[in-house]
């Protein structure tokens, strides 16, 4: 089942995050992920969460692939680069739906 990982964050250390992004590209692909959108905050006219500087939307082939990526022991030294590179990290997982019927029940 296709999943979307919504990542919202502020960049704290550009070098650390750049290292994470560079090294994460191949493993993300290996586990069925693909960055499908990135954005830089333009404005925040409405909402309950504090605005974040960066949006990254990753499409995954499955929830299992997400957790394989996150828990791969060979990537143990990779994730700290993300943690050191960002602040105020929000990570939400969404199941793909074709229309709103599943949430309007």
Question: Which residues fall in each region the model found?
Answer:
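Short S/T/G/P-rich N-terminal loop/turn motif that feeds into the first structured element of a domain
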Residues: 1-73, 92-105
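Intrinsic disorder/low-complexity signature
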Residues: 4, 84-85
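A common structural junction motif
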Residues: 29-30, 74-80, 86
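A short, amphipathic edge element
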Residues: 87-91
